[in-house]
A protein has these predicted regions:
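Active-site loop/lid in soluble adenylation, ligation, and acyl-transfer enzymes
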Residues: 1-119
Length: 119
Protein backbone atom coordinates (compact mmCIF):
# COMPACT_ATOMS: atom_id res chain seq x y z
CA UNK A 1 0.00 0.00 0.00
CA UNK A 2 1.35 3.39 -1.01
CA UNK A 3 -1.29 5.62 0.56
CA UNK A 4 -4.19 5.31 3.00
CA UNK A 5 -6.87 7.98 2.80
CA UNK A 6 -10.10 8.23 4.76
CA UNK A 7 -12.07 5.93 2.45
CA UNK A 8 -9.58 4.93 -0.27
CA UNK A 9 -6.28 3.08 -0.47
CA UNK A 10 -3.69 3.34 -3.25
CA UNK A 11 -1.65 0.26 -4.13
CA UNK A 12 1.24 -0.34 -6.52
CA UNK A 13 0.89 -2.87 -9.36
CA UNK A 14 3.31 -4.87 -11.49
CA UNK A 15 3.14 -2.04 -14.04
CA UNK A 16 5.12 0.99 -12.79
CA UNK A 17 2.78 3.32 -14.73
CA UNK A 18 -0.44 1.94 -13.20
CA UNK A 19 -1.82 2.12 -9.67
CA UNK A 20 -4.75 0.36 -8.05
CA UNK A 21 -7.36 2.28 -6.06
CA UNK A 22 -9.29 0.31 -3.44
CA UNK A 23 -12.46 1.91 -2.12
CA UNK A 24 -13.24 0.82 1.45
CA UNK A 25 -16.50 0.44 3.34
CA UNK A 26 -15.41 3.11 5.83
CA UNK A 27 -17.47 6.23 6.54
CA UNK A 28 -16.03 9.75 6.60
CA UNK A 29 -18.14 12.46 8.21
CA UNK A 30 -16.92 16.03 8.78
CA UNK A 31 -13.45 14.89 7.65
CA UNK A 32 -13.36 12.19 10.37
CA UNK A 33 -13.48 8.40 10.03
CA UNK A 34 -16.45 6.79 11.80
CA UNK A 35 -15.76 3.33 13.32
CA UNK A 36 -18.85 1.76 11.67
CA UNK A 37 -18.71 0.26 8.19
CA UNK A 38 -21.32 0.27 5.42
CA UNK A 39 -21.40 -3.06 3.58
CA UNK A 40 -20.55 -2.70 -0.15
CA UNK A 41 -19.94 1.06 0.18
CA UNK A 42 -16.55 0.56 -1.50
CA UNK A 43 -18.23 -1.14 -4.43
CA UNK A 44 -20.75 1.69 -4.72
CA UNK A 45 -18.01 4.35 -4.67
CA UNK A 46 -16.00 2.45 -7.27
CA UNK A 47 -18.98 2.04 -9.63
CA UNK A 48 -19.96 5.71 -9.22
CA UNK A 49 -16.40 6.85 -9.87
CA UNK A 50 -16.09 4.70 -12.98
CA UNK A 51 -19.47 5.90 -14.28
CA UNK A 52 -18.50 9.58 -14.11
CA UNK A 53 -15.00 9.09 -15.52
CA UNK A 54 -16.38 7.07 -18.44
CA UNK A 55 -19.07 9.69 -19.09
CA UNK A 56 -16.47 12.49 -19.10
CA UNK A 57 -14.38 10.58 -21.63
CA UNK A 58 -17.35 9.55 -23.82
CA UNK A 59 -18.49 13.18 -24.02
CA UNK A 60 -14.93 14.26 -24.92
CA UNK A 61 -14.73 16.61 -21.95
CA UNK A 62 -11.18 15.47 -21.17
CA UNK A 63 -9.10 12.38 -20.62
CA UNK A 64 -9.00 10.74 -17.20
CA UNK A 65 -6.61 8.48 -15.36
CA UNK A 66 -9.07 5.54 -15.25
CA UNK A 67 -7.75 2.43 -16.99
CA UNK A 68 -10.35 -0.15 -15.94
CA UNK A 69 -12.49 -1.45 -13.11
CA UNK A 70 -10.74 -4.67 -12.12
CA UNK A 71 -12.99 -5.82 -9.24
CA UNK A 72 -16.07 -4.70 -7.33
CA UNK A 73 -14.22 -2.24 -5.08
CA UNK A 74 -11.05 -1.62 -7.10
CA UNK A 75 -9.96 0.13 -10.27
CA UNK A 76 -6.70 0.59 -12.13
CA UNK A 77 -5.55 4.12 -12.91
CA UNK A 78 -2.65 5.67 -14.78
CA UNK A 79 0.04 6.95 -12.46
CA UNK A 80 0.41 10.70 -12.77
CA UNK A 81 2.54 13.32 -11.13
CA UNK A 82 0.32 15.51 -8.99
CA UNK A 83 1.68 19.04 -8.68
CA UNK A 84 0.52 20.32 -5.31
CA UNK A 85 1.68 23.92 -5.68
CA UNK A 86 0.10 25.84 -8.60
CA UNK A 87 3.23 27.93 -9.08
CA UNK A 88 5.30 24.78 -9.58
CA UNK A 89 3.79 23.95 -12.99
CA UNK A 90 6.46 24.52 -15.66
CA UNK A 91 5.28 27.01 -18.30
CA UNK A 92 6.31 24.69 -21.15
CA UNK A 93 4.39 21.70 -19.77
CA UNK A 94 1.75 20.61 -22.30
CA UNK A 95 -0.22 18.04 -20.28
CA UNK A 96 -1.10 18.88 -16.71
CA UNK A 97 -3.20 16.66 -14.47
CA UNK A 98 -5.50 18.90 -12.47
CA UNK A 99 -6.69 17.05 -9.36
CA UNK A 100 -10.40 17.59 -8.84
CA UNK A 101 -12.61 16.24 -6.11
CA UNK A 102 -16.36 16.11 -6.48
CA UNK A 103 -18.54 15.63 -3.43
CA UNK A 104 -22.21 15.01 -4.15
CA UNK A 105 -24.72 15.59 -1.38
CA UNK A 106 -28.44 16.15 -1.16
CA UNK A 107 -27.67 19.48 0.50
CA UNK A 108 -24.67 21.64 1.40
CA UNK A 109 -23.11 20.71 4.75
CA UNK A 110 -19.88 20.42 6.70
CA UNK A 111 -16.80 22.32 5.60
CA UNK A 112 -18.45 23.22 2.27
CA UNK A 113 -21.30 24.94 4.14
CA UNK A 114 -18.82 26.86 6.32
CA UNK A 115 -16.89 28.01 3.22
CA UNK A 116 -20.15 29.08 1.57
CA UNK A 117 -21.15 31.09 4.65
CA UNK A 118 -17.79 32.90 4.63
CA UNK A 119 -18.39 33.91 1.01
Amino acid sequence: MLYQGKVKQVWSTDDPDVLEFRFTNQISVFDQIIPSLIPRKGESLNRTTAHWFKLVEEENVCGTHLVEVNSADRCLVRKVEVIKEPGAIPRDMEWVFVPLEFICRHYLSGSAWRRFQRG
